[in-house]
Amino acid sequence: MAVEIEVETPLQDDVQGLIAELNKALLELTPPEFCFHMTAEQMAAADTTVFIARDGGAAVACGALRRHEDGVGEVKRMYTRPSHRGRRIGAAIVDRIETLARQQGMTRLVLETGDRHPAAWTVYERAGFTRCGPVLDYPDSAWSVFYEKTLTA
């Protein structure tokens, strides 16, 4: 069965479980003060669109687009369960995020990820993101790696 990616509410029990796994995974690699989590409730806000990948109905991956001022979109909450890694599900979610950002007139995507997440770097770099300095209101930290991508028409 093919993995399907759709916009969904993060307030569903199984999606909240996926978010809890994401938070746990981040805290295993990064000090809490440098983990910039969003709760499921924050992810359900009007400024954020959440994409959920499902395999046979089970939530297996997520990612979100958070809208900021001046045409900037932020890639947030990217996670794929270990059982589904290596299948380019994360890349497909990033593609969906970028497509939505373009449709909504955004001109730039940015993101913050951890310094111990080389698999994530690969996903972003393959999607055309380049490393940059700190973005939005994130602190400049050795624990963070920042990326950006200019969106052209």
Language model segments and positions:
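C-terminal "cap" of GNAT-fold acetyltransferases
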Residues: 2-3, 10-11, 107-110, 114-128, ...
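Alpha-helix N-cap and coil->helix boundary residues
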Residues: 34-35, 88, 119
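Active-site acidic-Proline motif in GNAT/NAT acetyltransferases
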Residues: 81-83, 87, 115
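Short coil/turn segments at alpha/beta junctions that flank glycine-rich nucleotide-binding fingerprints
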Residues: 87, 103-107
